[in-house]
């Protein structure tokens, strides 16, 4: 099996690409890879919903920290890899309906990123296998094939190239979901990945790790866009109570205060223009603990 031949670097890259790709398998535009359904043509009968989905997914991925960044922040906290935090691959057999399979595909994708970031190669192989198993049950098992892996390895130093690779993969997924009217699947995958990512981050955060606390606080933005995305599928049976669950988490994030700073420009060592801004973020220990408890409760509902 090809996964046995991968180095931990390759697995880490596959984890990143996998999360991005599976998040893309339902709705969007071909303009950007972060547009969730670029693979799927725009539904002209619902132009407003299509536009909302594209915008929501774009914003979600703009505010989610990369696996590499999150791993660095977790490591700086002094935390060690904890396999017990991940959703056991033994649970995969329990997931028999579309909602369970899609949400936990996102969960396993986040766990795969977590394991590979800590160079846990054997764990990474297990979780890659679990993710592919759920993808097969959902009918999107060809999303990560050997050609994609080779392209990822060839372009591993260029994030822009990786993004383009996922954009190209959009087209391969069009038939899987559009023809069977399952566009909501991708939204559930994104939700699962978001839930697990926040769960892992809050499980490692400490009172003195300000950077990790800030990144957790900033998920206030991605959660808003995630809810906007899910709202476009309101009434679709497969979603169940996930919108209400996300809004319950959002209520706690209302206590997070983020004041945007002045936008500044600079150049990196290669002379490229860099644009950024510094924000003032306020999140109390009480709010952080409440978010941690809530995300754990919600997450446990979906992995059991």
Predicted region positions:
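A cross-kingdom marker for long, charged
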Residues: 28, 234-304
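C-terminal motif of bacterial Sec signal peptides marking the signal peptidase cleavage site
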Residues: 20-24
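Secondary-structure edge/capping motif, primarily at the C-terminal ends of alpha-helices
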Residues: 112-119, 138, 142, 176-180, ...
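Bacterial lipoprotein signal-peptidase II cleavage site
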Residues: 25-33
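Extended amphipathic alpha-helical interaction segments
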Residues: 158-243
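N-terminal Sec/ER secretory leader and immediately downstream segment
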Residues: 34-151
């Amino acid at each position: 099996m090809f996964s046995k031949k991968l180095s931990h670097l390759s697995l880490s890259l596959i984890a990143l690409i996998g999360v991005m790709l599976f998040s893309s398998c339902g709705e969007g535009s071909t303009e950007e890879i972060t547009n969730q359904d670029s693979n799927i043509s725009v539904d002209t009968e619902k132009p407003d919903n299509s536009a909302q989905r594209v915008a929501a997914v774009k914003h979600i991925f703009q505010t989610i920290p990369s696996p590499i960044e999150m791993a660095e922040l977790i490591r700086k906290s002094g935390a060690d890899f904890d396999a017990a935090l991940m959703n056991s691959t033994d649970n995969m057999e329990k997931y028999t309906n579309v909602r369970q399979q899609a949400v936990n595909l996102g969960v396993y994708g986040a766990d795969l990123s977590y394991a590979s970031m800590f160079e846990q190669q054997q764990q990474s192989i297990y979780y890659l296998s679990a993710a592919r198993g759920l993808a097969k049950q959902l009918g999107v098992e060809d999303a990560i094939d050997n050609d994609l892996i080779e392209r990822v390895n060839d372009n591993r130093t260029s994030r822009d190239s990786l993004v383009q690779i996922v954009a190209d993969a959009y087209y391969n997924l069009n038939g899987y979901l559009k023809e069977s009217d399952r566009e909501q699947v991708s939204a559930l995958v994104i939700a699962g990945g978001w839930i697990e990512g926040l769960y892992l981050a809050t499980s490692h955060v400490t009172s003195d790790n300000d950077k990790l606390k800030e990144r957790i606080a900033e998920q206030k933005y991605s959660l808003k866009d995630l809810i906007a995305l899910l709202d476009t599928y309101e009434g679709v049976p497969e979603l169940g109570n996930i919108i209400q669950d996300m809004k319950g988490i959002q209520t706690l994030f209302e206590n997070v205060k983020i004041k945007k700073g002045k936008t500044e420009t600079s150049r990196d060592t290669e002379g490229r223009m860099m644009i950024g801004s510094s924000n003032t973020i306020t999140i109390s220990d009480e709010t952080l603990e409440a978010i941690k408890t809530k995300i754990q409760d919600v997450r446990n509902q979906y992995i059991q």
